[in-house]
């Protein structure tokens, strides 16, 4: 939008400046590119370029997830896209700023908003889920470990350990017998319905799994800072959450979690929560249960024609769980096509220079 001027050749009764030419510049963060990707697959190469363009568009002073519309620093992108960001860019200057933004946005009671900086306060009927969600706020605890695993630099963990602990303590106040029941869940999951709030997977399952994840990371952080009391306290808390999770969501007769959706089963598999009580009532990893839940996950993907049904949150855990278990051919089938859901769909409808990553696969 241009105001206070007219294009060359247009009427100009007010004698405004005349624009002879306008040049648009692609501006993004100065984080240095550190890797390249090239394969023999046309779809994968184009998808990588598509994603790269989307990432650069969102890498401003704040890492946003929507550069043309909301322009807010939605926090789930930080850890869900964290591995891809760290593989592709040098974030040694950018990541500390992201962490400081989160620390500054943290509320006095330890709560984390869904965006940082928190320029917008989500209030009113139906807006609670947008105000705070464990899958979003959890970036405060999860992302420093991604940074550490990439660079071997534990400074973010040590500096923000008090913030991380305050957030976990806050989540504990929101839990009912170990279960969290608020937030956006597997936002924008895929199916024969209008995308938005999670439909395939229960919100409490996704929220509680992320609660468990943040506590487990905090235990690691406590070991790194040498806080013995916190090590024991949060290890016990993690165990309580894991037990509550399995009691609430595991269907032993079918070896399914929650609704049996891809996200429902992928999350506990990814987090190694597939545990069961022994004769003494102690929960331990159950290899047989893990195998059966994983088999059900594969069956569901195949039942959907080798297509995913996960959303913004579940995508990462689905792909990582399949990859960890050697299902590379299945992952290939899931993305080597030009149908929805998949990146290939947008590649056949729009020419390369104008091609952008859409908000959904539909």
Range-by-range predicted roles:
Residues 9-17, 86-99, 106-109, 148-165, ...:
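Structural helix-adjacent loops and short alpha-helical linkers that scaffold large soluble proteins
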Residues 60-62, 66, 109-140, 172-308, ...:
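The feature captures the catalytic groove of carbohydrate-active enzymes
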Residues 348-362:
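Single conserved hydrophobic/aromatic residue that forms the stacking wall/gate
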Residues 32-36, 40, 334-347, 351:
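Acidic glycine/proline-rich low-complexity segments
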Residues 48, 52, 195-200, 351, ...:
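Surface-exposed acidic, glycine/proline-enriched linker/cap segments
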Residues 314-344:
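Catalytic-core region of carbohydrate-active enzymes that cleave or remodel glycosidic bonds
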Residues 1, 9-173, 182, 314:
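Substrate-binding groove/exosite segments of carbohydrate-active enzymes
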